[in-house]
């Protein structure tokens, strides 16, 4: 398959290398040509399973060149980059292409809405995963280490009516697990569950320099807040009628006896900690805050509210991160009301997510 991979971060490197090693024709796009010289000779993937030096079909700063002939466009970029990305994609997409966001934080709906509002071309479908396919860190100009891969990758499609055909194309690439729709996948994203508590409750240590929030920063007290947020996420999912698996953090990530049922499989947390790659310098500009807190938590809170599920821990985190960032987070970012869905009932939103831009309600949400 011809695959375009957009971005130059750790996730993009891991994606491009892994898919190229799997035999796909991969072209990588980055905004600046000066950033591409290092990968034109290939990207080295250090990982369990598939690994080695991956040769790319091309590496280019010309987005049109990267997208030309690509059946699949993978965007392993933070959700904070989606606004810029959609402006670039608008004139170039074709109605045969699939755009995959890894993960999406409900970006599949947000990007489709933004494209429609600005007159851009809509693809065949948007898809989004509920988590990162790889837990990875770049370790050199053309090297990336991915000690952990997703083994269960919840994947939602917008419009959900096109799920069968989209997942049939994605299944040879990833261990996709069918989600009901894009919001189902977005509410499986545990980044907003784990990262905001880890950052907030370790703020003092983080201010002191390099620190591993997943190791020293994960104490019993921190876990209590993570578990509370996850409990509210599960209540929201049930309120929306989404079926299991819910990928509960307490049992499918922190509990080794059930980790095989989780997003990353047995031993995932141990592999992450043993790698030492997450002993790093964090700040309020890190995606743990700008993406997982500002966007992910705002989505969780609004989804809970729409489903009449209580979310005091999520709301409290939003208020505190709003103070730290100096701006209001509640009702903004990826909150449903910020995406034109605030006036719709839960059942109307689910119908819209299924029918997509063919729905009579589409014109209301793109005003």
Language-model features: where?
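Short, well-ordered alpha-helix to beta-strand connector turns
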Residues: 23, 56-57, 70, 96
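Rossmann-like NAD(P)(H) cofactor-binding subdomain of soluble oxidoreductases
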Residues: 74, 79-142
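Long, low-complexity C-terminal extensions of enzymes
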Residues: 254-258, 266-353, 360
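Substrate/ligand-engaging "lid" and interaction regions
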Residues: 133-229, 352-366
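Small-residue-rich helix-loop
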Residues: 222, 230-272
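Short acidic low-complexity segments
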Residues: 55-69, 179
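NAD(P)+-binding Rossmann beta1-loop-alpha1 motif at the extreme N-terminus of oxidoreductases
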Residues: 1-48
């Amino acid at each position: 398959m011809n695959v375009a991979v957009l971005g130059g971060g750790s996730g993009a490197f891991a994606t491009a290398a892994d898919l190229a090693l799997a035999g796909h024709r991969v072209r990588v796009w980055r905004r600046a040509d000066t950033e591409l010289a290092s990968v034109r000779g290939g990207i080295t993937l250090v990982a369990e399973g598939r690994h080695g030096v991956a040769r790319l079909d091309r590496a280019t700063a010309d987005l049109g060149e990267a997208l030309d002939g690509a059946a699949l466009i993978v965007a392993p970029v933070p959700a904070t980059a989606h606004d810029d990305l959609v402006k670039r994609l608008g004139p170039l997409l074709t109605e045969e292409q699939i755009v995959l966001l890894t993960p999406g934080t409900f970006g599949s709906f947000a990007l489709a809405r933004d494209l429609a509002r600005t007159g851009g071309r809509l693809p065949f479908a948007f898809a989004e995963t509920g988590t990162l396919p790889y837990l990875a860190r770049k370790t050199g100009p053309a090297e990336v280490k991915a000690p952990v891969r997703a083994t269960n990758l919840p994947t939602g499609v917008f419009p959900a009516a096109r799920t069968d055909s989209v997942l049939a194309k994605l299944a040879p690439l990833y261990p996709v697990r069918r989600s009901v729709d894009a919001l189902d996948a977005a509410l499986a994203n545990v980044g907003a569950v784990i990262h905001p508590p880890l950052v907030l409750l370790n703020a003092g240590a983080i201010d002191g320099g390099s620190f591993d929030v997943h190791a020293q920063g994960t104490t019993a007290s921190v876990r209590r807040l993570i578990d509370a947020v996850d409990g509210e996420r599960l209540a929201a999912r049930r309120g929306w009628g989404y079926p299991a698996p819910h990928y509960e953090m307490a049992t499918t990530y922190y509990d080794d006896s059930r980790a095989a049922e989780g997003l990353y499989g047995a031993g995932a947390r141990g592999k992450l900690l043993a790698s030492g790659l997450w002993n790093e310098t964090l700040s309020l500009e890190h995606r743990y805050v700008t993406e997982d807190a500002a966007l992910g938590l705002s989505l969780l809170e609004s989804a809970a509210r729409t489903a009449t599920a209580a979310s005091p821990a999520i709301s409290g985190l939003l208020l505190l991160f709003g103070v730290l960032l100096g701006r209001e987070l509640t009702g903004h970012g990826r909150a449903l009301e910020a995406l034109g869905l605030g006036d719709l009932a839960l059942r109307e939103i689910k119908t819209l997510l299924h029918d997509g831009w063919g729905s009579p309600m589409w014109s209301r949400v793109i005003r």
